[in-house]
Amino acid sequence: EADGTIILSNDGNGIDIAKHPEYDVWIPELIFGHLRTSTNYDKSEKRIVGGKNGFGFKLALIWSTYGRIETVDHRRGLKYVQEFRGNLDVIEEPVITKVPKSSKPYTKVLFKPDYARLGLQGLDANMVALFKKRVCDIAAVTDHSIKSVKVGFNDELVPVKNFQQYVDRYVGSKGETKRIYETTDERWEYAVALAPNQEFTQVSFVNGICTFKGGKHVDYIMGQITRKLCDYIEKRKKIKVSPTAIKEQIMLFLRCDVVNPSFDSQTKDYMNTPSAKFGSTCQVSDTFIEKIAKLGVMDVACSLIEAKDNKLA
């Protein structure tokens, strides 16, 4: 919005409009306005979701001067609207009205960040660009297999309907930039292109969360790629290359689902769950390795070794 208010909406099923049996608080208020009320604490229950501690939107409200939630529970025929003010110091009583059970469900949340407290004048172009990038992330990792999900930003649909189209946004179309793609099952998919400037680059997701710094999931896939490529090159070229010589040529795109993932911080930039606890396995195929080699990785790695040997000679 022009005044810096941020709005998010989802036209899936609404939130149950009922009081929580244990806390005697309306469930939407509990979800959005009370800290540490997540249902994802129980580590004995295997989940492949991103949220865990129940902070999320509550932190947004704490750093906002105003917030509002709306949801339609079409099963109960109810609409719920509630406002929050003063950095979550004030939680207004909800307004609950009856609606026809034929009403389309939805959930909408909005908040106006406390720009003064954050030392900002408002949203700048870089922040808006980051929001748009995150919306593209959501479109890329959303399951479109059952029903095509439309994802939009500022009233414009995002032209991303799967992970491969997301890769296109980084490296261009397949005609512009060669890349190799593979998926083993619904929990693992990945693509490799040549890294710009021969510097390893990764774009990865765990349970829909963008892990900017990578993590054990990236190490898991890259470990297989570098090890298998080293063996492949040694067999065909009789040259030993280092895993580093392979890695620095690769740009990896990875999307995976991991059971009860853990991260090094609340920002969830780095996933540190060991591979033994992923809840699934992924084996990079020999065909995928051969295609990466032919992408140019093998020739460059061999050239680097030969250049080093000539320099030493």
Which residue ranges define each predicted feature?
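GHKL-type ATPase core
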Residues: 2-22, 38-169
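GHKL/Histidine-kinase-like ATPase module
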Residues: 92-96, 129-140, 144-269
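Non-catalytic alpha-helical coupling and interface elements of nucleotide-dependent molecular machines
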Residues: 13-17, 33-40, 64-72, 114, ...
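Extended active-site and interfacial segments that coordinate phosphate-rich ligands
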Residues: 13, 20-38, 81-102, 125-134, ...
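Helical mechanochemical/support elements of P-loop NTPase systems and associated helical scaffolds
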Residues: 4, 24-28, 51-59, 63, ...
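Extended, well-ordered alpha-helical scaffold/bundle regions in very large, multi-domain proteins
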Residues: 243-311
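Active-site-adjacent bridging/hinge elements
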Residues: 5, 29-40, 108, 191-203, ...
